[in-house]
C-alpha cells in the first residue's frame, strides 16, 4: 500500500518538474536582465495571434503564449503526448506528429466524435480541434496524411507515456477545456516543434525585421505595379496557387497590373511565425482598385532560397478568420463547451489514438 502511494506521489511530482523548470528559467533570465523569446514567435498581434500554442515534443508540453505588445508572454503549460514514433511526420500512418505551423479549422464535440467514429469516438475525450495539416509547405515537401488534431482522452494514464498517439497532440480533458478558452478557429495557430529554441532580444528583432522588410518590398512593388520587382519575391521553382505555377501567376498579375489606375492596398494585424525551414506571415488585407474592392485574411508561406533570401511559395486569401474584427479585444470564454454536457468518465475504457 505504501509503495503504491509512493509511486503515485512520485508520478505527480514528475509531472510538475518541467513546468517548475520553465518558471525557474524565466526567473533566472529576468534576474540577469536578459530577454529571451521563443524562436517561432517573431511578431504577434491582437487579432490573428492574440494567443498561440507551441507543442514541444521533447518535453511533452503544450505552451500557451499571449501577445504582449507584439512579443510572446508565457501564460501556462500543459502536459501532452504526441506520436508513438519520434521524428517529423512524412507519410500517412507513420505514427509521427508533424512539425510546423498550423491553424485550427474546425472543432468536433464529444457527441460529434461518437457520431463520426461510433464507440471508438470516446477515445478522443472532451473534443478535438482539427488542424490544417498538411499545409502548403507540407504539400511541397510531399508529406501525406491527415487528421492531425489537438484533443483530449478518455484514458489520462496515457499522459505519462509521452509517445502514445497516432500523430495527434493529446492532453487531459480539463486541460483541453482550459486551453479552449483561448482558441479561435482560423486565428489561433499551433506551432509544433521537437525542441523549443529561444532567441535573445537582438537576434529575435533581426529575424523579424528581415522578413518584415521583405514583405514591405513586396507590398511596394505591388502598389507600384512593378511586375519584375513583385515577382522577384516569389520562388520560381516552388510557387503554386489556384492560378497555377510561377509562370502562370506572373502572366495573370501582368494582366492585372495593366489595368488603369493605382490600387490602394493596406495591410493590418500582421503576425510573423517561423518553423525550422519556413515562415508564415498573416495579415488583414484591404485592396481597392477601379474594378475590385475587397478585404480578407492573407497568409504568405515563405522559404529561404539557396542564397538565404525569403521567397513566397504559396499565398492563401480567405474570408475565414475575419469574424469579430469589429471587437476591441479578445475575451477568453468557454465558446466551444458552452452547451456541452460532457462529463469525464473515469471508468471508461482505454483509448490509443
Question: Where do the language-model regions lie?
Answer:
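Surface-exposed, charged secondary-structure patches
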Residues: 96-97, 122, 251-299
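Exported/periplasmic cell-wall-interacting domains
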Residues: 95, 110-216
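Gly/Pro-biased beta-strand-loop elements
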Residues: 36-149, 328
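Short, aromatic-enriched amphipathic alpha-helices that serve as compact interaction elements
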Residues: 207-226, 233
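Short, solvent-exposed secondary-structure junction/capping segments
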Residues: 231-244
Amino acid at each position: 500500500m505504501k509503495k503504491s502511494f509512493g509511486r503515485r506521489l512520485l508520478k505527480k511530482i514528475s509531472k510538475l518538474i518541467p513546468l517548475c523548470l520553465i518558471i525557474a528559467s524565466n526567473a533566472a533570465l529576468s534576474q540577469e536582465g536578459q530577454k529571451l523569446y521563443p524562436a517561432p514567435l517573431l511578431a504577434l498581434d491582437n487579432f490573428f495571434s492574440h494567443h498561440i500554442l507551441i507543442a514541444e515534443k521533447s518535453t511533452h508540453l503544450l505552451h500557451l503564449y499571449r501577445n504582449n505588445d507584439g512579443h510572446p508572454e508565457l501564460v501556462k503549460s500543459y502536459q501532452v503526448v504526441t506520436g508513438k514514433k519520434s521524428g517529423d511526420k512524412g507519410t500517412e500512418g507513420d505514427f509521427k506528429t508533424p512539425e510546423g505551423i498550423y491553424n485550427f479549422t474546425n472543432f468536433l464535440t464529444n457527441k460529434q466524435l461518437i457520431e463520426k467514429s461510433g464507440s471508438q469516438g470516446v477515445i478522443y475525450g472532451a473534443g478535438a480541434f482539427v488542424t490544417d495539416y498538411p499545409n502548403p509547405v507540407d504539400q511541397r515537401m510531399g508529406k501525406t496524411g491527415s487528421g492531425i488534431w489537438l484533443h483530449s482522452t478518455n484514458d489520462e494514464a496515457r499522459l505519462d507515456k509521452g509517445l502514445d498517439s497516432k500523430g495527434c497532440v493529446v492532453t487531459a480533458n480539463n486541460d483541453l477545456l482550459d486551453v479552449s478558452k483561448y482558441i479561435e478557429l482560423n486565428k489561433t495557430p499551433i506551432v509544433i516543434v521537437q525542441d523549443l529554441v529561444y532567441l535573445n532580444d537582438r537576434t529575435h528583432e533581426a529575424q523579424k525585421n528581415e522578413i518584415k522588410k521583405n514583405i514591405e518590398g513586396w507590398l511596394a512593388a505591388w502598389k507600384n505595379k512593378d511586375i519584375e520587382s513583385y515577382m522577384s519575391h516569389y520562388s520560381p521553382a516552388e510557387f503554386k496557387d489556384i492560378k497555377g505555377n510561377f509562370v502562370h501567376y506572373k502572366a495573370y498579375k501582368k494582366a492585372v497590373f495593366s489595368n488603369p489606375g493605382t490600387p490602394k492596398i493596406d495591410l493590418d494585424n500582421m503576425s510573423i511565425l517561423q518553423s525550422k525551414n519556413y515562415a508564415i506571415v498573416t495579415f488583414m488585407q484591404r485592396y481597392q482598385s477601379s474594378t475590385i474592392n475587397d478585404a480578407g485574411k492573407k497568409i504568405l508561406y515563405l522559404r529561404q532560397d539557396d542564397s538565404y533570401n525569403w521567397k513566397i511559395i504559396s499565398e492563401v486569401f480567405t474570408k475565414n478568420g475575419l469574424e469579430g474584427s469589429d471587437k476591441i479585444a479578445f475575451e477568453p470564454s468557454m465558446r466551444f463547451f458552452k452547451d456541452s454536457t460532457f462529463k469525464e468518465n473515469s471508468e471508461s475504457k482505454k483509448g490509443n489514438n
